[in-house]
Amino acid sequence: MRVALFPGSFDPVTWGHIDLVKRASLIFDKVIVLVANNSAKNYLLSDVERYELTFEVIASLGWSKIFVDRYDGIILDYALKNDIGFIVRGVRAFHDFEFEFERYVVNNKLSPLVDTIFLPSSDRYLFVRSDLVKELIKNKNFDLSSFIPELVQKKLKSKFIDKLS
């Protein structure tokens, strides 16, 4: 069975993430969406909230080959511990590729057992970023349905509109 890992912070999960996960599921037998923590980032949502929201969104789509997990550690370590041979990384533009390629080189030096697959973002999601969504959610009048699922928009607005205004 060909299993792939799609890691990210998902703060929050966007249509861009979902598109990449769906496309990865066409290539692999199983895809694990891994909600990970990066100590260099400041999160709007807690790790539990990010996991639960990502899980709810994926579950609502009914895709049987896609699973959600969370991990607080090195992504390569998770892949090795769980016998996962591939890490899928989305690439929006050249700066994403440069960053992800450096990560690939390091991972490959540490363990050639796990390979990295780069998927370019679909045109319609090239400029969809979680940090952009967090900035836009401050204005409750914006319709963010082209960036995030309605479930995510409702959750963010109900939870954070008072804190962010």
From Swiss-Prot:
Keywords: ATP-binding, Coenzyme A biosynthesis, Cytoplasm, Magnesium, Nucleotide-binding, Nucleotidyltransferase, Transferase. Its main location: cytoplasm. Pfam families: CTP_transf_like. Its cofactor is Mg(2+). It is an enzyme of class 2 (transferase). GO terms for biological process: coenzyme A biosynthetic process. The record marks 17 as: Transition state stabilizer. Pathway: Cofactor biosynthesis; coenzyme A biosynthesis; CoA from (R)-pantothenate: step 4/5. One of its GO terms (molecular function) is pantetheine-phosphate adenylyltransferase activity. It is found in: Cytoplasm. It catalyses: (R)-4'-phosphopantetheine + ATP + H(+) = 3'-dephospho-CoA + diphosphate. GO terms for cellular component: cytoplasm. ATP binds at residues 9-10, 17, 90-92, 100, 125-131. It comes from the Bacteria. Its EC number is 2.7.7.3. Substrate binds at residues 9, 41, 75, 89. Homohexamer. HAMAP family: PPAT_bact. Reversibly transfers an adenylyl group from ATP to 4'-phosphopantetheine, yielding dephospho-CoA (dPCoA) and pyrophosphate. Belongs to the bacterial CoaD family. This is Phosphopantetheine adenylyltransferase. It comes from Borrelia hermsii (strain HS1 / DAH).
